């Protein structure tokens, strides 16, 4: 009888052990399969031609890779072809989609070309900028004010000779880079034409954002006159002292006809390909929560390299110092994974 009890007891223990082992094996198998599946998914971000989008790409990539185990990559290029790639699904994410043409944007969303996940930020400025020393001078650098009183774009023609360099027939005004969104380029040209600026100034279109930045910085460091399109947040405006020429307050009718007023504050959104939700659901959820501001973007830019990208060491420091910003964007498990990497 005693032997029978021992046999029954041993059988029960064996059944429990096999059950536990089977469950554990299934769980390990599930975790392994999920891990392998994630490693096979490459999340592609559009690395557009301005610094702030590169900085946001680096922040998002770090959270995606370290938090969830997905691979990421970036594709560089111009705004418009990259956005077409987003529609086709060869690009997964655009971290800064400037909603300039709202009708086309909404039409694309309604036709399932891509999906808006979040508004990244919308508290930015853009327009015609000049160095502050042109208006106020700079005693430390021995620069006298050459355009004292120039504070509004409508008055630019009164000061056109200040911008004229020796040997040139017309002064120059620097436009948006050729790689920027076509809607923005067209809006800028319309504005300048109706202010009669294009008849008195030669418009220069930089090949890319880096050339635009280089033009402004070179003039500033030499203490020379400069006028051109720029925006904030940007590393150039945060580092060098430029002022934006004022315009009349934004008016929808004026803006759409002549453009002779402030630009509207477009939403700068995060958009994703239709495939992202199924291919990388955790990434989709993360970006639905992702929201920053011009101030936060300038913080990112302050630690970026000249290219706009951020080193891993600086990114870890940013994440440590701004934990309250990103903690609620990610799941608890992803948060714990990320924390381990930044200590």
Language model region names:
Residues 37-52, 70-75, 170-174, 287:
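Short, well-ordered beta-strand elements
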Residues 118-128, 209-211, 236-286:
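Periplasmic-binding protein-like
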Residues 51-70, 189-192:
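Short, polar/charged alpha-helical segment
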Residues 18-22:
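C-terminal motif of bacterial Sec signal peptides marking the signal peptidase cleavage site
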Residues 85, 91-98, 174-251, 343:
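Ligand-binding pocket segment of bilobal, Venus flytrap-like solute-binding proteins
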Residues 114-174:
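A conserved helix-loop-strand patch within extracytoplasmic ligand-binding domains
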Residues 41, 52, 181-199, 210-221, ...:
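An extracytoplasmic/periplasmic, membrane-proximal ligand-sensing/linker region
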Residues 126-144, 177, 265-279, 302-303:
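A bilobed periplasmic-binding-protein/Venus flytrap-type ligand-binding module shared by bacterial periplasmic
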């Amino acid at each position: 009888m005693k032997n029978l009890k021992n046999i029954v007891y041993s059988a029960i223990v064996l059944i429990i052990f096999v059950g536990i082992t089977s469950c554990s094996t299934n769980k390990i198998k599930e975790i392994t399969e999920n891990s392998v599946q994630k490693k096979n998914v490459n999340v592609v971000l559009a690395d557009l031609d301005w610094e702030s989008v590169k900085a946001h790409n680096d922040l998002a990539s770090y959270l995606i890779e370290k938090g969830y185990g997905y691979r990421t990559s970036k594709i560089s290029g111009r705004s418009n072809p990259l956005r077409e790639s987003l529609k086709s699904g060869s690009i997964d994410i655009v971290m800064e989609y400037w909603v300039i043409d709202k009708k086309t944007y909404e039409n694309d969303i309604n036709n399932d070309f891509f999906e808006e996940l979040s508004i990244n930020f919308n508290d930015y400025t853009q327009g015609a900028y000049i160095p502050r020393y042109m208006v106020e001078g700079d005693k430390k650098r021995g620069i006298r004010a050459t355009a004292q009183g120039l504070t509004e774009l409508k008055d630019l023609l009164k000061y056109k000779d200040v911008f004229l360099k020796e040997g040139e027939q017309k002064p120059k005004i620097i436009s948006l880079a050729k790689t920027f969104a076509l809607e923005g380029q067209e809006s800028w040209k319309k504005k300048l034409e109706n202010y009669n600026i294009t008849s008195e100034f030669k418009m220069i279109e930089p090949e890319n954002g880096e050339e635009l930045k280089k033009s402004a910085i070179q003039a500033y460091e030499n203490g020379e006159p400069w006028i051109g399109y720029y925006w904030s947040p940007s590393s150039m405006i945060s580092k060098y002292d430029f002022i934006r020429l004022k315009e009349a307050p934004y008016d929808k009718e004026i803006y759409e006809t002549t453009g002779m007023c402030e630009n509207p504050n477009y939403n700068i959104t995060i958009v994703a390909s239709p495939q992202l939700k199924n291919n990388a659901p955790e990434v989709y959820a993360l970006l639905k929560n992702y929201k920053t501001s011009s101030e936060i973007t300038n913080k990112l830019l302050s630690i970026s390299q000249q290219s706009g990208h951020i080193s891993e060491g600086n990114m870890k420091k940013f994440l440590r110092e701004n934990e309250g910003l990103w903690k609620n964007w990610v799941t608890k498990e992803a948060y714990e994974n990320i924390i381990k990497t930044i200590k």
